[in-house]
Swiss-Prot record:
Compartments it resides in: Nucleus; Chromosome
UniProt lineage: Eukaryota, Cryptophyceae, Pyrenomonadales, Pyrenomonadaceae, Pyrenomonas
The protein's name in its UniProt record: Histone H4
Modified residues (N6-methyllysine): K21
Keywords: Acetylation, Chromosome, DNA-binding, Methylation, Nucleosome core, Nucleus
Biological source species: Pyrenomonas salina
Primary localisation category: nucleus
Similarity comment text for this entry: Belongs to the histone H4 family.
GO cellular component terms, semicolon-separated: nucleosome; nucleus
Modified residues (N6-acetyllysine): K17
């Protein structure tokens, strides 16, 4: 084993950094046209104006759950890098099997 020792910081519970960028309103990066394109791919013709914020909130909850599980797999393997397989296993755990990314 490499010299990791006991304890150590897990992902997601790191100590304070000197210059930490404050992350807020990043969900607004999912733009209205991006949501519209996803809906078009799903076969939607017309979209209500209220859909965009609702879609952002649902997507945020979904990604938080997947990322939490993926980071749990990463920490269990004592790695600091989340791999594609961590995400595949996290999705599989939630009943959304994804093919084409190894494993």
């Amino acid at each position: 084993m490499s010299g990791r020792g006991k304890g150590g910081k897990g992902l997601g519970k790191g100590g304070a950094k000197r210059h930490r960028k404050v992350l807020r309103d990043n969900i607004q990066g999912i733009t209205k046209p991006a949501i519209r394109r996803l809906a078009r791919r799903g076969g939607v013709k017309r979209i209500s104006g209220l859909i965009y914020e609702e879609t952002r909130s649902v997507l945020k909850v979904f990604l938080e759950n997947v990322i939490r599980d993926a980071v749990t797999y990463t920490e269990h393997a004592r790695r600091k890098t989340v791999t594609a397989m961590d995400v595949v296993y996290a999705l599989k755990r939630q009943g959304r099997t994804l093919y084409g990314f190894g494993g």
